[in-house]
């Protein structure tokens, strides 16, 4: 049976269509995925992301442990609350998962990892903690609500109380802050400004209701996926996995090769890949022909060979079909995509497609 978040009853009250996602019963939409998408781009929407896995990493060895575990380097983090996006890698250089790390002190970090990979991630993290003075604590006592959109911050601030409201109001992008049992990060997965708010599970339903009264529209997994695709943000299990390097997933920027003396899981494999060259490119596609781009469709790249779409769909903001794809190194700006057996013209672009409500590519 699927697990339920603390907001499960709220979703049922709102008439959500519920689906299984990574073992959790989650809302796909509340009536109109397109309307929910536009609400986030134009005003404010909220997502129940309580299924995400929150892990507190504490101890005198926390910093050294994370510098070994993650491809990005937590030593960059100097200001309390600052967040870092990174991948955990296999020794062969594949992606175990992507995650966000919040730096609270040299002995205290908070990690937010994906829901569908919870058990695998926790086991991986614990196995690699051997020899480090570190304690890993899963925070399954917390719920999490993401409020996103151009008016999302203001509407969230209007219903936050006391100290956490002051903390949240002062946050810069990609920084988090804590007050009591509440934690707010100015982060998200939509390409819009907003907050991701962690709070005691028992307090989540009332907070959800207050946000709704303030004019924040509930949004489901369907809108979350089209928003993150427009924002050019990777989805684990589609755009990268244990068989694919971050260097071929548009994530080279998340790998810290400096300082050279830092060893991290997967480093040697990535250095070999870099030295060998010929890495596939991770690109955006805009369909210029008919149909809708979908994952696993073949990308016909002429003399360069073939690539594959990793994520695709219709962009409600742009009114065209877009995709993320992995293509051979020598691919030109024009390609064709095999859409149901018919080659359709498409154009290579550099993601993102949309950020902060504005188109980033020519249509």
Swiss-Prot record:
A Pfam family of this chain: GCV_T_C
Keywords linked to the UniProt accession: Aminotransferase, Transferase
Gene3D superfamilies reported for this sequence: Aminomethyltransferase beta-barrel domains, Aminomethyltransferase fragment, Probable tRNA modification gtpase trme, domain 1
The superkingdom listed in its UniProt entry is Bacteria
Which cysteines pair up through disulfides? They are none
Q: Name one GO cellular component term.
A: glycine cleavage complex
UniProt record, GO biological process: glycine decarboxylation via glycine cleavage system
- Show the InterPro entries listed in the entry: GCS_T, GCS_T_bac, GCST_C, GCV_T_N, GcvT/YgfZ/DmdA, GcvT/YgfZ_C, TrmE/GcvT_dom1
Protein family per UniProt: Belongs to the GcvT family.
Q: In its UniProt entry, what is this protein called? A: Aminomethyltransferase
